[in-house]
Every structure is written in structure tokens, then in C-alpha cells.
Amino acid sequence: MPAVRGKSKSKAPVTFGDLAIYFSQEEWEWLSPMQKDLYEDVMLENYHNLVSVGLACRRPNIIALLEKGKAPWVIEPSRRRWGPESGSKYETKKLPPNSCHKSGPSICEKPTSSQQKVPTEKAKHNKSSVPSKSKKEHSGKKSLKCNLCGKTFFRSLSLKLHQDFHTGERSYECSTCRHVFRQILSLILHQRVHNWNKSYECDKCGDIFNKKLTLMIHRRIHNGKESFHHEKASDSCPSLSLHRNNHTTDSVHQCRKCGKVFSRMSSLLLHKRSHNRKKIQKYNKYKRGFKKQPVLVHKRVCIGKKTHESKKALIQSARQKTCQSENPFMCGKCGKSFSRISALMLHQRIHTSGNPYKCDKCQKDFGRLSTLILHLRIHSGEKQFKCSKCEKVCSRLSSFIQHQKIHKRKKKLIACKECGKMFGGMKNLKVHLNIHSEEKPFKCNKCSKVFGRQSFLSEHQRIHTGEKPYQCEECGKAFSHRISLTRHKRIHSEDRPYECDLCGKAFSQSAHLAQHERIHTGEKPYACKICKKSFAQRISLILHERSHTGERPYECNECGKAFSSGSDLIRHQRSHSSEKPYECSKCGKAYSRSSSLIRHQSIHSEETP
């Protein structure tokens, strides 16, 4: 059983022996890895706290072993090994470390030099390991044998602790909650739960600490007392030399897991907690631990599948298989997924009319506070973004950024060879080409179109359903994609930074300017692969290709009739609703199609002389 060192007197200073706990080899082996780590952290922290206030002058062997990552158990002489304390015959319950109750003076009275090797449990005894006289003096002690398994022990407490495992006896009871434990270390670890909220208050400044030792260190600030000064006590205490290491730039404490070094033990203890927080996935077949990406490769090795040839393919596959687990909160209306429920709640305000932020002047509602702040600038007339080149002032940062693109050098548009989409630079084109090269496991059930991500498929399916979850706050117009809403909002802003050099017409987007310039140049970069017919706009090519394939993705919910374009579906739906949005300004007659209104207006033009 581990023995707690003898308690100090009421007026005596705190020593390392008052805080230390020692184990035999058998007791140490019974501890779990988590208990060993906690024991190591607590012992090192207590020792270095004592060193910082000058209360520990000699460096115990057990501290040297712990800092080197070696087992700190007390060795019994029959095992013929050497531990942190010399021999089991030494009474560990009443004497400080490195002392013998029979031989008198401490064997390790003198501190070991830096070149001396600290003996460990792996080092065997030789003639110079332990004095022969001391060895003979303790050889007469009888060993104790377990009646159940025949194992021998040299301490009655060790035998009692061993027999508890046969009987299942739990002899250590918590005085607070009456919970019973088999080992004293388990009881000590358990009592930290009750003592966690225990506070120690400074009677001078009122600062509160959760440890009594920390309060003692703090009180030295008010007392102005220091045990050792750099100028006076040069070599009087090894604790001072150890304390001086904190002021040097040399890193002396190294993490055994990652190799990182620190100048202070407290920093190392804080760093070691970061390793414990890391969650590592375990594959049940071999009980091996992996991080996210390697576990995918390991699973394929176990089931006989080929691994990915490149890291890029591995990341793409992991993204496809874990997209739902990484974003567990999915919107029930548009299918978009989020990693946090707060982001989902903020997103759902787009679909609902419950906009919590209201303008006091025009009573308009907004879903986000940032949108309301931008809206208030309309009433106040505030314009804070001023262009340094042309003195133009914009009320929004996005409009200011778009305006600055006018003064930048125009980039030559580069077309994608796969789909014909235009880009302003090679960098953007390379990013776009990844769409064509990656795997597309998500397939649409209606038109058989494939996509690389689930979110792309969800956005595409809105074409068939006609769902438009994104609504403009200015005019109420709805869109099926967020990017379409973003582009539409630029119509309401007065800023049109992209101007045609030939006719002076201005546009809010560079893509619209590029399409307009083709009217002057006659360029038609989009060619049909079947009939070789060319078009100036990409959407015109897409609509034309549907005449060859017969694809009609837009279906009417009322009668089931399908159309190749969304505008044809909108015109058809007006036949069910009898809606006639096109009204003549002269006679008030209304039509469901704009072409019918144009033909009607020709009648009024003929009547005029």
C-alpha cells in the first residue's frame, strides 16, 4: 500500500515528504496509465512549487526518475533491482526519501552530479550499488507469503493490498460521500472532486486560490520575504540553481510524446494536457488508433480494398463520406447542412418571416443585425467608403470593392475547355477545373445529372421542384440559389462599376459586361458539339443543347407538363392562375406574355398620325 510521508508539525515548513506518495513495483503495476500520468503530473507540480519558494533544497531521486520518464516505484531487495529509494527494508512511512531507519545517515546524502547516472529499475545491482554492510544488516527480515497464490512480499501492507484483489475488499472510504475504494490512490484521486471548489482567500488583498500552497506563494508578495537571493546565496541551495533555469533561455523540459521543449515544468504540464484532449478514432478490427485521414486508408487495408494513390484523392473521398457527419444539422426546406445548431437557426430565418431586427423608421424587418445596420445608412445618408482615385463615395463595403475593380487592369477572360465558362485569371480557372476532375457520386433521380457534393445536388433539385428559398429583402423577389440573390441585390444599389468602353453602358457585374461586349465584337465562344452552332451566351447554348437531348427539367406541379427552360414554365403557369402581368399603359389591357403586349402596342402606334 502506498505510504504517505509523515505529517509535518504545525509550525514547521512544508517539505516534499509531506506531499509525496511512494509505491512498490507491484503497486505501480496495478495502476492504470491514466493514474500513472496523473501521479507524475501531481508529484512534479508539487516539487517545482516547493522549489519556487525555496522549500526544497535537495532533488529527490524520484523526481529525477519522473522527469526522465522512468518508473518511480520503491524496489524490494530480493528483486535485485534499484529503484528511486534504496531497498524495501527502508521504512517509507516515517522517514524521508533516501534514508534508512537502521543505518542512520542517508545513503544518498550528497547530491548527484550531472554526469552521474541515476539508477533505474532496469539496472542490476553490482558490488558498488549498495553498501555491503547495510545489505547484511537487513538480511534477517522474513518474507510474507500469500496463502491463496503463494506470492511473497517483504511488507505486510503490500501483502494486505495484494489480498484485497482476491477478496474484493474495499477498505478506503471517502469521508465526504462514503464511497469506498480498494487503493488509496483511487481515494486520493476521488477526493479531488470534493476539494476542487475549495478556496483559500488571502487576508490582505482578498485574492482567492484553489490550493493552499499557491496561497503560501502569493503571501510572499505581501511579506516581501525571499528565502534565497541571487546575489547572496550562490551555491547554498540547489533549489536556487534550479530556479535560475527559469530566467535562462535554455529549454530543459522536453515532452516525451512530441519532443517539444519548455523552460518551465508548469508550461510542460499544461502542454501535456493538449495530448490528452485529442480524440483519436479507433478501428475495432486491430484496436489501432488513427486520426481522421489515416483511418480511412487502414480500413481499406483490412477489407482488401486498394488505397488512394494520392493525398488529394484521399481528401476527396473522405469529404464525400463524412459530409453528413461533419454537418449534422440540416435545413428541412433547402437541404443545406451546418456544423452548429446556431448556424442552422440563423439560416432558417431566410425561409421564415420571423425577422427579429426591425427598422424604426420604415418598419422593415431583417433577419440579421448586420443587414439592419447597412439598411439604416439609407435613412441617415451615411457614406463612409470613398475611392481615392475618382472621389466616388459608397455606402457599402461590397459596393466599394466592386467599384475599385474599374481602376484595376482588365484581365483577359479565359474559357474552360470542358464547359466553356469564362474566368478572369488562370488561378480561378485551375480551381474550376477541379470540378471536372473529381468524382461525382451524387446523381439526380429526375435528369440523371451527377455532382461531386451533396450540397450541389440539393441546389440542382430546386430546378425540378421550383423551390426558391432565398428572398430579396428589398423587392421580395425569390431565388433558388444564394449566389443568384447576391447578384440580384446589386441591382438595388446605385453602384455599377463595370462600364462599356464603346457605348458607355454600365453593369453591376463583370460577367454582364463581358456578355454585352460580345454584341459589339460579334464573338460567339460557345459552340454546340452536335451541330456546331455558336452562341454569345452560355445559357443560350444550354437551352439549345436540350433541343438535341430532349431534356425538359422544368415540370409544372398542376398538370405535369415539362419544359426545357424556366421562363417557358413561368409562362405556362400563368394559364392556370390567369395572371396577366403585362399591362398596356394607354388602354389598360393586360396580357400574360410580353410578346402579346408588344403586338398590342403596335395598334396604338398605327393610330397615331
Swiss-Prot record:
A zinc finger (C2H2-type) spans 144-166, 172-194, 200-222, 253-275, 329-351, 357-379, 385-407, 414-436, 442-464, 470-492, 498-520, 526-548, 554-576, 582-604. InterPro entries: KRAB, KRAB_dom_sf, Znf_C2H2_sf, Znf_C2H2_type. GO terms for biological process: regulation of DNA-templated transcription. It holds the Pfam family zf-C2H2. SMART domains: KRAB (SM00349), ZnF_C2H2 (SM00355). It comes from the Eukaryota. Residues 14-85 form the KRAB domain. Keywords: DNA-binding, Metal-binding, Nucleus, Repeat, Transcription, Transcription regulation, Zinc, Zinc-finger. GO terms for molecular function: DNA binding; zinc ion binding. CDD domains: KRAB_A-box. GO terms for cellular component: nucleus. It is found in: Nucleus. The keyword Phosphoprotein does not apply. Residues 81-140 are annotated as: Disordered. Its main location: nucleus. SUPFAM superfamilies: beta-beta-alpha zinc fingers (SSF57667), KRAB domain (Kruppel-associated box) (SSF109640). Belongs to the krueppel C2H2-type zinc-finger protein family. May be involved in transcriptional regulation. This is Zinc finger protein 667. It comes from Mus musculus.
